Amino acid sequence: IPTNAHQAMQAAAQFGVKPVIGFGWSSGDGIPDLASTSEPSNNSFTNMETRQNFRAMVAAFAVQYHPAYLFLGNETNSYFVTHTQAEWLAWVSLFEECYDAIKAASPTTLVYTVFQLEKMKGLGKHAGWTYPAHWQIIQDHLRNGKIDALGFTSYPYFEYQTVAQIPADYFNMLTSKLQ
């Protein structure tokens, strides 16, 4: 368990707040840090040692802290757009394994992942992005029911220069895309 996760839980207890803890594994560009001793050239979620270590870490965190909220991966669609379909599905399967391990230790923990909204929509010209919209990957997570929520980061300035340019219904499509 990373030291900063322990520190966050200690600070939350000290100040009486309910923390939202997340375990990320890549840069905002989708470049992961998943290599291991046994597979140093495999920087993907097909790396068996990495999968085992990540699953064990989140399970240990759930056993020790029983968090109310726990998200695995931040802006995970950045991984989708930079990796193969097989590598993406390996992440989804690991997420589901982690979900089961977390729920076994802490049944009430809300477990979810986070996507980057502008990238998901196929926007981001000011960030240099040219990715097509990829809403379908949400269904990869919803298919087996092993996810409690979805989170999104949003930076409209990646596409729009002024607030006035942002469509009034900018966030409305989320409800239709999540059904």
Model-derived segments and spans:
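Active-site groove signature of glycoside hydrolases
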Residues: 55-88, 112-117, 156
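Second-shell loop/turn segments in exported
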Residues: 43-48, 83-85
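Short, acidic/polar
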Residues: 51-61, 125-142
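Aromatic-lined substrate-binding rim segments of carbohydrate-active enzymes
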Residues: 1-40, 53, 57-59, 85-112, ...
